[in-house]
Amino acid sequence: MKSINTLIPDIYNVMESKEHDGDLSSIAMQAGREVEDAIKDAFTPREDNRGLRMSGIGRCERAQWYNYKGYTPEAIKGEVYLTFLQGHVLEAVLVALIKLSGHTVTDQQKKHTIEGVNGSQDCTIDGELVDIKTASAWSWENKFKESGIADDAFGYIKQLSAYGKGDKRKK
């Protein structure tokens, strides 16, 4: 049985060896559908979502309060939308590679509600709750050091903890 601890070298190995687990066509088709959905979603007008979401954990509390109270936020710029789209596309490709490298992926986009706050986790890999994140070179060097994300400025640990609470996880 594979372990999340070997995930990255396993992905590199499957890319080098071309020896994969699972049905390549089926996994590639699923990734393609997810990329298609991400592109369509990027061009779908946004609904007015004034509620709190688990993905907002770690965001500026003042900005969340203004949003929740109905104040009009600044318009999101094209480059920000492109960053979001890149993250969704890369997530689809990475999940495909994770499956092809023999790891178990479950609970993709599983919905959670904790005390009225909604969220959807990315997936569970080899039994471990995972939220797939992309990072620029600057973010990687400055926020994701070997010591981890101890200060958790983006609220990633709190967000994962909320999903874990939804699953009644102990750790």
PLM regions and their residue ranges:
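Substrate-binding beta-hairpin/strand module that engages nucleic acids
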Residues: 165-171
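Metal-dependent nuclease catalytic cores that hydrolyze phosphodiester bonds in DNA/RNA
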Residues: 1-129, 136-154
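Active-site phosphate/pyrophosphate- and oxyanion-stabilizing loops and adjacent acidic/basic residues
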Residues: 161
